[in-house]
A protein has these predicted regions:
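Insoluble glucan recognition modules
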Residues: 1-231
């Protein structure tokens, strides 16, 4: 009698992914942490400004220095014109991009894919008039490069700030963020059933007033953590 037994792969998906490059924070020094997509193990994203001919590497920990060849596929959905330059991921066309890295277990290995999307940051919820069906989220305006700030439209009403990065077709709450002590705090796998104030605490809740705006500095800091304020 043969008894079939299932043996799960011993390999596990990474808990972190970082990017490091010629234009990310301090060049070739800052390892920028990517954010986990809520409920999607092995799925990470980050927003970066990449000027013409910028290059970067990546890793599941700082100083790992993985490159172009370590992706099974690269899907450029943003017109970046991506190539391999000495192992680096090189972008010919400068601009703001969302980098989406997905890891998938394949036997005893992990296949990684990289997708480029046009960067989008948006405001939703009370500050944008509520979650009424048919009310579109309000896009933030990107600066010319990462020396400037992303700026939202004026909030139309007051309430708790709800904002997010649009990553492919993922729902907004999977890629949501707030501000914690002036720094961008990504939701990742935080369990938020109602709102930040109720489920995480008042320090995670940003009160938005009508006429105010959200200002974000993205991809410029040495520690790779973005900053923001409402005023």
């Amino acid at each position: 009698q043969v008894i079939a037994t299932y043996q799960a792969p011993s390999i596990t998906l990474p808990e972190d992914i970082y990017v490091c490059g010629s234009s990310i924070g301090t060049a070739w020094t800052t390892w920028r942490p990517m954010a986990l997509i809520n409920g999607m193990a092995g799925n990470f994203f980050t927003i970066v400004y990449l000027p013409n001919d910028a290059e970067f590497k990546w890793g599941t920990y700082p100083q790992q220095w993985l490159g172009h060849a370590d992706f099974k596929t690269i899907d450029d959905q943003a017109g970046a014109d991506v190539s391999d330059n000495g192992g680096n991921v090189k972008v010919k066309n400068g601009g703001w991009y969302t980098l989406y890295i997905k890891g998938k277990i394949n036997g005893e290995a992990i296949d990684y894919t990289l997708t480029f999307y046009p960067a989008q940051l948006l405001v939703t919820g009370d500050a944008n008039g509520g979650f009424t069906p048919g009310t579109p989220s309000a896009p933030m305006i990107a600066p010319a490069d990462n020396t400037g700030q992303w700026i939202s439209a004026e909030f139309v009403s007051g309430g708790e700030l709800r904002a997010y990065a649009q990553v492919g077709d993922f729902d907004w709450w999977k890629t949501e963020f707030t501000l914690l002590e002036g720094k961008v705090f990504w939701r990742e796998n935080a369990n938020i059933a109602s709102n930040w104030n109720t489920d995480m605490g008042s320090e995670y809740s940003v009160n938005a007033g009508a006429g105010q705006k959200l200002y974000l500095t993205v991809g410029a800091t040495e520690d790779g953590v973005d900053t923001g304020e409402v005023k």
